[in-house]
Every structure is written in structure tokens, then in C-alpha cells.
Design a protein with these regions (language model features):
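A short hydrophobic/small-residue beta-strand
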Residues: 7, 81-82
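Short alpha-helix
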Residues: 106-128
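Conserved Class I S-adenosyl-L-methionine
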Residues: 127-193
Length: 193
């Protein structure tokens, strides 16, 4: 609603694209918003086609460095990338949380190192900021917790489903305990000419 630009959303799951299209129609935006069910590892864009790539909370699926490198080709000269990425907020931290994240996402790193990796991938860093705590608790973990009973019911309370739920609950506990050491950081970079 706040831009006149054309937006192409991607998601691996066709159901999410269907939902996007329904919402775009509902809001009168279907002439500017389209969706494609595709993997971010196989994007269907032409070199230099896009002004902006904005993988909100998802670049970790293929890795920060790989995403920056591979997606750069799709940006026009001076095009922008805007990514949110889990990052260390301190240079030192308790072993327990370091081990947890190194096991779950080995590319976690400090903000300064993430910015350096952005530069090495051919971008000029424009800005970065730490997302507020409510983004984790209210926008991510709360809906996740609310859906746990339905998830367990859907998968008949199977052992694998229970284990997955426990991993998610452990992650929530780790965040509450160690949120001063890590968070999601929003990085904005401009493709170098």
C-alpha cells in the first residue's frame, strides 16, 4: 500500500503463495503483487532485473554468505539487499548459548563480521539495526507456541513431532535467558557497480 513498485514474493510452499494472492486481492493490490512457489536456491529472475531483494528472516536457509553472493546477480547496478540475520551482539558469551547456535546455525557471527562479509560479497553497507525484543517474543515465538497443540494433533503426538516441539521450546528458553548476547539484525547493502 505504501509503494507503487511491483513486488514478486517467493515461497517454497504453494499454499503460502495462494494465501498471498488472496490477501493481495482483498487489499486491491493484485495488480502490483505476484507470487511464485520456488526455492530460493533456484530463483527465476534475469540478471539485473531487480531493484531490491528482501529475504525477511530466511537467508539462513541457504546461508548468509551464499545468499549475498548468488542473489547479487539479480540486482540492478545500485540495487539493494535487505536481510535480517541472527547475529551475536557481543564478542563473548556463555558457552551454553554459543554451543547451541554453533550447532543450529554455524554462520552466526558478530555484527561487524556480518558487515565485512557483506562487503566481501560486493555490497556497500548502507545501514544495520537490531530488531527489538518483541519481534522475537510477540511476532515469532508467541504464534509458534500457540500453534503447538494443533501441530502435535496433526502429527498424532508422534515422537518426532514431540522432539521438534521440544527443540523449539528450548530455543525460546535460550532466547529468554541469553537475549542480551544475540538477536536478529537487519542489514541493508547496495550492490557495487
Amino acid at each position: 500500500e505504501n509503494t507503487k513498485g511491483q513486488i514478486t514474493a517467493i515461497d517454497l510452499f504453494p499454499k503460502m503463495i495462494t494465501l498471498l494472492k488472496e490477501r493481495a486481492i482483498h487489499h486491491g493490490l493484485s495488480d502490483r503483487i505476484s507470487g511464485i512457489a520456488v526455492s530460493m536456491e533456484n530463483l527465476p529472475f534475469e540478471p539485473g532485473e531487480l531493484d531490491l531483494i528482501w529475504p525477511e528472516g530466511s537467508i539462513y536457509n541457504i546461508g548468509f554468505e551464499r545468499g549475498l553472493r548468488e542473489w547479487k546477480q539479480f540486482l540492478k547496478p545500485g540495487g539493494m539487499i535487505a536481510v535480517s540475520e541472527v547475529s551475536w551482539l557481543t564478542n563473548t558469551r556463555p558457552d551454553e548459548i554459543e554451543q547451541f547456535w554453533n550447532f543450529n546455525y554455524a554462520e552466526i557471527d558478530t555484527i561487524s563480521n556480518k558487515i565485512k562479509k557483506m562487503e566481501e560479497a560486493g555490497y556497500t553497507p548502507v545501514a544495520h539495526f537490531i530488531l527489538p525484543e518483541y519481534c522475537w517474543l510477540d511476532c515469532f515465538y508467541k504464534p509458534m507456541q500457540e500453534n503447538i497443540p494443533l501441530f502435535l494433533e496433526k502429527y498424532k503426538n508422534s515422537k518426532p513431532a514431540q522432539q521438534l516441539v521440544q527443540r523449539e521450546l528450548d530455543e525460546i528458553d535460550y532466547y529468554r535467558k541469553y537475549k542480551s548476547y544475540y538477536g536478529y539484525v537487519f542489514y541493508i547493502g547496495m550492490k557495487n557497480e
